[in-house]
A protein has these predicted regions:
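Double-stranded RNA-binding/processing signature
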Residues: 1-172
């Protein structure tokens, strides 16, 4: 894949061009590729996913805290968890075209429904390393919450735990 094409695709998704594209390449590399660096260590998006998960929690927590000034901790925690839950991240990755950029060995992508959400988190980790916390904040506010997710709608949406439990029990 050419860097120029990737730069353009990332610009479409992120709203800015990367400074160091290597972070973003790694963020889009699923472990099924089995790529190794010169020292023989695996190169994939798992570490960036770990970092992105933590940064995403902080950024979304910050946004929720600012957006709902009079709300209690329980409401804020619940709202943040709804915004960063796996289903939400998978849906965002699909809608934004992140899934199409992930390098994997075809077999795993069809069986791993979390791959897109994991790549989304890894991209947040890449943004953080490449451009810092403020860039992650801008990305979430301008690209995600302003265009793709209504924070008030998510915050006040009731989660039907009974139907979730039934759904889970039927799958397992």
């Amino acid at each position: 894949r050419k860097d120029k094409e990737l730069y353009f695709s990332l610009y479409e998704i992120l709203g800015f061009y990367p400074h160091d594209i290597s972070y973003y390449k790694m963020a889009l590399m699923h472990k099924s590729i089995m790529h190794r660096n010169a020292k023989g260590k695996p190169v994939n998006n798992e570490r960036l996913e770990f970092l992105g998960d933590a940064v995403l929690d902080a950024v979304v927590g910050d946004i929720v805290y600012q957006h709902f000034p009079g709300k209690r901790e329980g409401f804020l925690t619940n709202t943040r968890s709804k915004l960063v839950q796996r289903d939400t991240l998978n849906k965002l990755a699909q809608e934004m075209g992140i899934n199409q950029l992930v390098l994997s060995n075809g077999h795993s992508s069809s069986h791993n429904s979390y791959m897109g959400g994991n790549a989304f988190e890894a991209l947040v980790g890449a943004i953080y390393l490449d451009r810092g916390y403020d860039a992650c904040m801008q990305f979430m506010q301008k690209r995600i919450l302003a265009k793709m997710i209504n924070i008030d709608k998510v915050a006040y949406k009731e989660v039907n735990f009974k139907s979730k439990l039934i759904e889970w029990s039927q799958k397992n």
